[in-house]
Amino acid sequence: MAEKRTLIAVIADEDTTTGLLLAGIGQITPETQEKNFFVYQEGKTTKEEITDKFNHFTEERDDIAILLINQHIAENIRARVDSFTNAFPAILEIPSKDHPYDPEKDSVLKRVRKLFGE
């Protein structure tokens, strides 16, 4: 199952997405013409759109190995992010230009702390 998961997907603001695309993670699947990124626009993107893309990348696509999501965007769908327990894709919360990273909010670090009894 993991051998066909080769892509990194992104749910992020425009600057973060642009930087990652320039670094080479952009991919459009030939069969379906689906992108592996979603650009969040402050004040325009709805919580439902974020949830739909998160579900699409985590449940419907079988070629995604890692999902990068800006932490401030993950906060909009925190319950959904925290409830995701599958091994693939790995969910990594990343900072953005305007929103610094807060380890107290990171769902992966919360699980690690819980595992070690902290």
From Swiss-Prot:
It is a peripheral membrane protein. It holds the Pfam family ATP-synt_F. One of its GO terms (biological process) is endosomal lumen acidification. One of its GO terms (cellular component) is vacuolar proton-transporting V-type ATPase, V1 domain. It is found in: Vacuole membrane. Its main location: membrane. One of its GO terms (molecular function) is proton-transporting ATPase activity, rotational mechanism. Keywords: Hydrogen ion transport, Ion transport, Membrane, Transport, Vacuole. The keyword Metal-binding does not apply. InterPro entries: ATPase_V1-cplx_f_g_su (IPR008218), ATPase_V1-cplx_fsu_euk (IPR005772), ATPase_V1_fsu_sf (IPR036906). The keyword Transcription regulation does not apply. Present with 4050 molecules/cell in log phase SD medium. V-ATPase is a heteromultimeric enzyme composed of a peripheral catalytic V1 complex (components A to H) attached to an integral membrane V0 proton pore complex (components: a, c, c', c'', d, e, f and VOA1). Subunit of the V1 complex of vacuolar(H+)-ATPase (V-ATPase), a multisubunit enzyme composed of a peripheral complex (V1) that hydrolyzes ATP and a membrane integral complex (V0) that translocates protons. V-ATPase is responsible for acidifying and maintaining the pH of intracellular compartments. PANTHER family: V-TYPE PROTON ATPASE SUBUNIT F, VACUOLAR ATP SYNTHASE SUBUNIT F. Belongs to the V-ATPase F subunit family. This is V-type proton ATPase subunit F. It comes from Saccharomyces cerevisiae (strain ATCC 204508 / S288c) (Baker's yeast). The gene is VMA7.
